[in-house]
Regions:
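Conserved donor-binding/catalytic core segment of Leloir-type glycosyltransferases
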Residues: 21-42, 48, 64
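A short, well-ordered alpha-helix in the C-terminal region of glycosyltransferases
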Residues: 180-195, 201-207, 211
Length: 219
């Protein structure tokens, strides 16, 4: 992950609040965020179901599903429309895309203000949006897909879940115990710093090159 990318830079807290407010999201209420393509493999409908379970215990909770969509992607357009229908007019569910003016800086603001970052993927390679949330020191709740397991050590720097009910339970745990969320977030950021930053890997390559050419083995 490139830490100098606009999506990975720290957003001024006041500006982050303004971004959320511009999309009718209350920055003073709990917020769940999933950033992903509008793709069935990301299980966005499962995220909405988990949100509804959480809302029974935390009526003030909000959900933002944030993604990008291409005009020549009819399946993505249909899924976006279906998601808005699944929200059922709930004013606390926000489904946003680049067509709404959500770009890198806005995505960063949503991730930074999230109380919980969700990545409920059924299938996932290396989840860059997981890393982005971890780098912002947010607690991440993710599915059991292979890429998620490469990034998250369950219970140490995030949570891995196998069902909608487990997803909701972990979210409730984080909302009820802010200290748990803070601890997970700290470990998550440190994990990214050590393992997933492009600058860290570049420094390691430079250190290797500085050692000079490798000697040919003697025969």
């Amino acid at each position: 992950m490139d830490p100098t990318s606009p999506k990975n830079l720290l957003v001024d807290p006041g500006r982050a609040r303004e971004v959320l407010s511009a999309f009718s999201v209350d920055p003073d209420r709990p917020l769940l965020v999933q950033v992903s393509r509008f793709d069935p493999w990301k299980d966005p409908f499962g995220v909405i179901d988990a949100y509804r379970i959480v809302k029974a215990e935390y009526p003030d909770v909000q959900l933002a599903l944030v993604g990008s969509i291409a005009l020549d992607d009819p399946e993505g357009v249909r899924l976006l429309d279906d998601l808005k229908g699944a929200a059922g007019g709930d004013p606390d569910v926000c489904v946003l895309s680049n067509q709404d003016g959500v770009h890198a800086a806005e995505v960063a603001a949503f991730q930074q203000k999230a109380d919980v970052v969700i990545q409920k993927s059924v299938r996932e390679g290396f989840g860059l949006t997981i890393t982005e949330g971890m780098w912002k020191a947010r607690p991440v709740v993710a599915g059991q897909a292979t890429g998620c397991r490469l990034q998250i050590e369950d219970g140490r720097n995030g949570y891995l879940i196998a069902s909608t009910e487990e997803c909701a339970a972990r979210i409730v745990q984080i909302l009820s115990r802010p200290d748990v969320g803070e601890s997970l977030g700290r470990e998550a950021r440190e994990t990214v710093r050590r393992r997933f930053l492009s600058t860290t890997h570049l420094a390691r390559y430079l250190s290797l090159f500085a050692q000079g050419p490798m000697r040919e083995p003697e025969v």
